[in-house]
From Swiss-Prot:
This is DNA-directed RNA polymerase subunit beta''. Belongs to the RNA polymerase beta' chain family. RpoC2 subfamily. It holds the Pfam family RNA_pol_Rpb1_4. Keywords: Chloroplast, DNA-directed RNA polymerase, Metal-binding, Nucleotidyltransferase, Plastid, Transcription, Transferase, Zinc. It catalyses: RNA(n) + a ribonucleoside 5'-triphosphate = RNA(n+1) + diphosphate. The keyword Methyltransferase does not apply. It comes from Nymphaea alba (White water-lily). SUPFAM superfamilies: beta and beta-prime subunits of DNA dependent RNA-polymerase.
Amino acid sequence: MEVLMAERADLVFHNKVIDGTAMKRLISRLIDHFGIAYTSHILDQVKTLGFQQATATSISLGIDDLLTTPSKRWLVQDAEQQSLILEKHHHYGNVHAVEKLRQSIEIWYATSEYLRQEMNLNFKMTDPSNPVHIMSYSGARGNASQVHQLVGMRGLMSDPQGQMIDLPIQSNLREGLSLTEYTISCYGARKGVVDTAVRTSDAGYLTRRLVEVVQHIVVRRTDCGSTRGISVSFRKGMTERIFIQTLIGRVLANDVYLGLRCIATRNQDIGIGLVNRFMTSRAQPIYIRTPFTCRSASWICRLCYGRSPTHGDLVELGEAVGIIAGQSIGEPGTQLTLRTFHTGGVFTGGTAEHVRAPSNGKIKFNEDLVHPTRTRHGHPAFLCYVDLYVTIESQDIIHSVNIPPKSFLLVQNDQYVESEQVIAEIRAGTSTFHFKERVRKHIYSDSEGEMHWSTGVYHAPEYTHGNVHFLPKTSHLWILSGGPCKSSLVPFSLHKDQDQMNVQSLSVQERSISDFSVNNNRVKHKLFGSDPLARKGRRISDYAAGSERVISNGDGDFIYPAILRENSYLLAKRRRNRFIIPFQYDPEWEKELTPHSSTSITVEIPANGILRRNSILAYFDDPRYRRSSSGITKYGIIEVDSIVKKEGLVEYRRPKESRPKYQMKVDRFFVIPEEVHILPGSSSIMVRNNSIIGVDTRITFNTRSQIGGLVRIEKKKKIELKIFSGGIHFPGETDKISRHIGILIPPGARKKMDKGSKGKNWEGNNWVYVQRITPIKKKYFVSVRPVVTYEIADGINLVTLFPGDMLQEKDNLRLQVVNYILYGDGKPIRGISHTSIQLVRTCLVLNWDQDKKGSIEKVQASSAEVRANDLIRYFIRIDLVKSPILYTGKRNDRSGSVIPDTGSYCANTNLFSSKVKIKSLSQHQGTVRTFLNRNKEGQSLIVFSSSNCSRINVSKYHNVTKESIKEKEDTPIPILNLLGPLGTVPKIHNFSPSYHSITHNEILLNKYLILDNKNPKQTFQLLKYYLVDENGRISNANPCSDIIFNLFGSCFLPHDYCEGTSTTRIISLGQFICENVCLSKHGTRIKSGQVIMVYLDSFIIRSAKPYLATRGATVHGDYGEIFYEGDTLVTFIYEKSRSGDITHGLPKVEQVLEVRSIDSISMNLEKRVEGWNEHITGILGIPWGFLIGAELTIAQSRVSLVNKIQKVYRSQGVQIHNKHIEIIVRQITSKVLVSEDGMSNVFSPGELIGLLRAERAGRALEEAICYRAVLLGITRASLNTQSFISEASFQETARVLAKAALRGRIDWLKGLKENVVLGGMIPVGTGFKRFVHRSREYNNIPLEIQKKNFFGGEMRDILFHHRELFCSCIPKPKSFHNTSEQPFYAMGSNPIVHKSGFIIS
């Protein structure tokens, strides 16, 4: 102290801020210099001084101290601009999702970091004494990153899985967060209290397991006599700090020489002075003793452990170093989980170094040495394999830059670069221990549509029938817009591929309809009329030819809400022996209908397409005759006693006729409404028979009446309860009315009624129904009920339906209009809730003239489609068939077609299937494309609507060559025909070489189908659906047909022929066009998509969304499969460095320690271990091979495990001494697994034994023991100790104890835990002396007596579980420690060099 006072004049005065780390260094140097007691005295004074100053300053924190950096606004704007450009590139399909994610994260991370630096500068310049600024640097409260979140921006957050959310939080906490930002910030992992709680318990459990593994490790010897060491040399890339940390407090394993002079001796501990000498001299590698090199198995010696971190001198005997080690690793975890802030673990694959241009100029390099590639961000670049010399020529000087191999060159040859422009990116060194993990990123579909792959990519699924494909190269996946009608099987007869239909949004509740082929052989196609109000003011876009069908079936019991649609006409054209009905709409109907009604004409075509005479072709349900409530139908006026004769016309009898239809000649009929409740026989009814109730009276426990009136109850099997609305009349004796049980009274007949009758029910101008009710004999009263009257109009006659046809040649087919009432006279109508009941149906009955030659009983009906003037019209075609029908194919075969004898072929007769689910079509108008379902039972449809298509006009005639080119004289080559839309190819049986088709351009084009001369009878297959590739190939999706029909090769001229015609690009059908591509001189911007129709002056694009997928990505689903919104399209597997963040670090530490990690760390170790085991034994022979193989693998894996765990903690600025980690790692790597190959009698195969024990046993026995090194996790290691009491108190108590009992294990109570459990004294600290004393006495007993005791006791353990016993049974009086002093390596003491720079000697 006096010395200090005397020298005070010479002391240096430091005017410097001391932060936490400087304080730590100061304290450690004080301890080194003065010792602990004196240091604590000094620190006490510092503490007092600190508190005095803090009180005097009295720093407080107000909200005004939180100053936002002014430059924040333009920094954020700049980042947003970059993100926008990136988003565009992603939209155009230039960058895939992972690249976008990486880049946006780096953009925002850079912005955030830059803002953080700006924040410090800003504080220093504007307000250096700002309390926020002072606190963040003193370490008193928060750190720079936390303050940055208060006044800068919060930046990027992780989601709970540790993935970055690429939407940054731009606000800071001072400005306040928006709702979205708040949600994300809650998401940001560990933000929540919950997360902290969970992680804390995780950290606690980690500590528990760590302590469990190493609790028995105590310092028991001064020197174990080990001659091995681990080499430490000052490598490139190693910071001084790490070098010092590694060496200080260790003990040297060998002498260290500088030249010939020995500067340090073996077993000397290394202090700061010695380290400085090592660093200045940079001597040869220094060998130090570590817990790894200690020769003992279940304890450790003082010299291998080194200095105690607390006192700074060699560790004391009896110190429980294991528990200290476990706690030192676990405790930072507990602490760090409470740090809830996180700046964002960034996806940098190791930060890349950039090479910048030295001056302006033109850049030149040898293009043969580079090849094009993509950078991590999806930018185009060149990868160079060897050193590349790049020259930059400016006006007067040539600069030469050397670019190392495996770098990315970011500029092109001969490009002009500016000074300081980045021209290359050097990849970060791969040797660094980066926590790389392979991450799967799923890309989901944004819209529903059809999957499409680009050309030139061969996609083979991994398994034969799998639908998971790996991409061999980078390519685009397209989702062509349009979704299926959401049904498994929709049998559409009339929709063809590429038809355009008009779908207003309709929601039909899904009903599963049973197989209707049993009771009714018909399917009904509903053609729906439209709502007149909806059409006004609506423009139909020019290519949207509308016609729309929804299929219903059954007997009309299901009545679906009609689809309202634009043009649905029904119009007849009569031709010779053929009758064509186009589906159109007559505007005359609008006037007849009430505004809210919806008309629907349902055309019935039987499933086999054959109609008989007098069968109903179509029917029309007039909405005026629709009821939703129950009632009774009555015809005629009973009061006048003129009951109209009704003829029951049972029409078209079938095996199971569902109900007769009544053809009527009356002009009106009546429905008497009543409310009917059919109740189970056991139900309790709360109203009496013949009583009068009001509206909403409770009838049973859970039903209420909807109308008021008289209650009638009939009891049969079930109780039928009817409520008659209306009034009650008690007649006098003179009333005429009493004779009738039930009559209808017209409005004029009221006055004749009895004037004395009470009640107001008689008044009014409506018909009433009078019914006599006799509740008991001779007492009766009359119920008067209102009646709903329906007038039957003349209905729709044929003239209104079918405008006259000019070209009537033979009127040999007739249609009659017939009205049918669906319910007989007096029949009750039962309404089901929420459905409407059709009372009258207007039907079209088909009839035809008798032919003189004979009667024709059947006609053939099919649907046809004609396109003209941009409109597609659909017709029902009815052919008279004179001869019996030939059935081809099976009866129920969907593809079986009907071929008449006469040779006229009728297409697509049987496209129905019997199971139907109708679901909602909610789209606007669109085109239909049929495709086959996976289960091959029926067709489904894709509807893509006009909102998904765009029409582009391009300059005229640039895609048509004027003349046909002739190659050979005879072969007709087709005129270039890109005009027609894609239509399906019909089956052509009597094949003619040219056929006509009506296209959109009102011109008939001859398409010549060229046939091979070798194969004249080429069959054409009806494609169920096909997809067009970019180069015009058509893939046939029907696996059953083996005929591949190349439509484009035969119909269209390939566009390679049009060489000199025009400079603008040829647009071919089926070509994919990315957004932003210029297609004509006017530079129209278009959306991305596939060309589906090409006209002379324009073409139509079906919009599609491109997704870029890189090589090795997994594509889910097959070509042409339908994807819904949110389905997984592609899975990318990419590497990212893990976020260097402790709570994501903890799981990492745990994964390393448990050796079960999902990422590549321990997998590599496991593989390495196996590889070593094989090679070494092959080289060195069995006993040495096993020993050295195990030793080397263990040494290797130990070093890499220690490094990986250290990396996590260092990334958080937590310093843990290597010794602690080494003790843990030593425990999880010290076991070997006995393998089956050697049949030794001592250990059973699959047993885990310590490596040292295996060595000794191998040396003692004549035969070799085969074993290999294994990495145990900490849990497994704690369940494989020498003490079963310790194991049982950890996990699986019953199992451990049962096994121990069966094996007769002995617990020698050497660890701490066993003694605590049994209440003994623990063998550490002061209790250690007694333990050592006891074991020494035991060692001195002569061997013979030991043997007697051993075999005299009840010892059944043949496996000798305890090493000391085992050693003492071998007849060698020497102690094992002496034998182990000789090096046991076959190669002497030559050090073995290991890749990572550590040398194992």
